[in-house]
C-alpha cells in the first residue's frame, strides 16, 4: 500500500460563505494533487472541505478522514469516507494535528490548540484569515 500525504483542514466549525468557498477550493486542489484530507468531522468547515474533495475528478472512497471528539460515529459529515470516533473530546486535536501538514481557516481556541500541536510536531502550517 502506498502512503498518501494527509493534510488537515482546521478552523471554526461555523465559517461564513467566503470561508466555505475557500475551503472547498483548497480541498478540491488537495485531492487533485493525490493527498487525503483530515478534519474534526463536525460543522460547516468539514462539510465544505468534503464537498470540495468529492468534486475533484480523481476523488476516491478513502480521501476524507473525520476524527470525531465523541464515541458516536453518527454525527460525522455525510461526505466522510473514514470515520474515527475517538471519545477524546478536545484531546483529539492532537490526532488531527499529527497530519503531514495543517491548513487553518478561521477558528478560535480549539484551532489555536491544533496549531500549537502541529507546531510541536514540526508540521507545515498555513493560515487563512477569514471570519469564523
What spans do the regions from the language model cover?
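Generic N-terminal amphipathic, Lys/Arg-enriched alpha-helix
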Residues: 2-17, 26-28, 32-33
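Acidic/glycine-enriched connector segments
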Residues: 24-31, 40-121, 127-131
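A conserved mid-protein helix/loop that constitutes part of the nucleotide-sugar donor-binding site
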Residues: 20-21
Amino acid at each position: 500500500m502506498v502512503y498518501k500525504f494527509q493534510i488537515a483542514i482546521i478552523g471554526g466549525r461555523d465559517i461564513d460563505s467566503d470561508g466555505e468557498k475557500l475551503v472547498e477550493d483548497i480541498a478540491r486542489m488537495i485531492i487533485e494533487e493525490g493527498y487525503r484530507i483530515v478534519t474534526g468531522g463536525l460543522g460547516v468547515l468539514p462539510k465544505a472541505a468534503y464537498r470540495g474533495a468529492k468534486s475533484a475528478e480523481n476523488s476516491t472512497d478513502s480521501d476524507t478522514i473525520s476524527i470525531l471528539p465523541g464515541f458516536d460515529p453518527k454525527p460525522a459529515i455525510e461526505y466522510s469516507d473514514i470515520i474515527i470516533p475517538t471519545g477524546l473530546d478536545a484531546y483529539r486535536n492532537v490526532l488531527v494535528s499529527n497530519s503531514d501538514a495543517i491548513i487553518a481557516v478561521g477558528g478560535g481556541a480549539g484551532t489555536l490548540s491544533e496549531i500549537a500541536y502541529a507546531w510541536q510536531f514540526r508540521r507545515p502550517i498555513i493560515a487563512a484569515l477569514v471570519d469564523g
